[in-house]
């Protein structure tokens, strides 16, 4: 380790011990050195004994800074790794960091743009409009048309911090399989690798710009969701320029009610937006926490969502969407056998999984959910229960499904905050059934033919030659098979003759031996010679 890494490691140890997180170390033989080593830091007692473990973990991550805050946020979606009390506390982590100096932001933008800010913008506001761990936002106007915009700029010093902390996380992850009995199954290095990829993706604002453009195109002229326009000509890897929006934060229930917002319709539209993104577009905003969602001031009776911060997105392939939709419908029909079969058919669990055992495990975990009214059943927790059960049957972690589960929990929690009587299943079921019908009905066949038509139009002139080549290959293959069959038959015949000669030879040798013992020497020699000769001929036939 470098001196810098050692200093950072000591800081992490100091923070963890001051919050009493050594309680997380399991009491097993392998961890004895760690538990003994704890006493070497006797000057770092637990200063927060009055708080539960989950809250102490959340506070420790907040104190360690933005990289660890975002890591905790990601871990809050991995409820297979943590008990609910800890996962719930991690979900409360807020990515709020004091802004860095506006003059430094201005300088960094000018470096990225390659010239003075006034070349492209007027009225640049040096005081940040908002700030987070990775970037912060400033307002300005485009010089060319006076359009109000926001400039999102990456923190200049964040990359070295991320790299240093991620290196430490990899080192810590390497200890987990040695310290925890179940550590290997948790695949800690893969968890850190996934987190590192997420962080590095967020550092590239050109990627976020592309995501926002795609989402805006998907919901163009939609009455449900508006995505601000991105000004691509001004975007750089560390600077994003997009339209400034005005709206009510979706978490401000009082303000929404004061302007007469149709809360029931708003909640239902949140669900519809989510399922439209997932099943129609295969491209969904995967960071839909309340800080990234606003509601337009216009038409409160016909409310419109406004989405920002498209740095994290998810996608599902056609097979995943099909199996996910069928899983939901089978679950709410309480067809647990079908749920188990779908997990096997999709490849989410190994093909040799015992379907009966899997069905029973799903039934045991999920049946109690139906003790509640349908309106109170959580889609997110349905997915959580299904995936946690499947992991006991060696289900591989599917990153796209983890993102989907996190987003669904956000959407569901938000919807019920807006309208507590929201029946998510009643809202979603018609959409899912309609989508499934569209995938297997006549429209799906026609659509598939249209998609394949250019390919077959290109290949059609080559078809006679391909058929001829195929017939020739079949003929050659048949000749090879016939030749091989003849060779095998000849070999089997020779082996049969050899076995017969070995048997005759053995009989003659035994008989010759008996005659020799009976003093019939001359006759016995003839039998023995004949036996040896029979063995020799049999051996030659096997060669």
UniProtKB/Swiss-Prot annotation:
Membrane topology classification: Single-pass membrane protein
Q: Name one GO molecular function term.
A: protein kinase activity
* GO cellular-component term (any): plasma membrane
- Write the Enzyme Commission number(s) for this entry: 2.7.-.-
Query: What InterPro entries would the database entry show?
Result: ABC1_dom, Kinase-like_dom_sf, UbiB, UbiB_bact, UbiB_kinase
Subcellular localization, as worded in the UniProt entry: Cell inner membrane
Task: Give UniProt keywords alphabetically.
Answer: ATP-binding, Cell inner membrane, Cell membrane, Kinase, Membrane, Nucleotide-binding, Transferase, Transmembrane, Transmembrane helix, Ubiquinone biosynthesis
Q: Which residues bind ATP?
A: 129-137, 152
Q: What residue ranges are annotated as transmembrane?
A: 514-534
Is the Transmembrane keyword given for this protein?
yes
Alphabetized PANTHER family for the sequence: CHAPERONE-ACTIVITY OF BC1 COMPLEX CABC1 -RELATED, PROTEIN ACTIVITY OF BC1 COMPLEX KINASE 7, CHLOROPLASTIC
Q: What does this protein do?
A: Is probably a protein kinase regulator of UbiI activity which is involved in aerobic coenzyme Q (ubiquinone) biosynthesis.
Name this protein carries in UniProt: Probable protein kinase UbiB
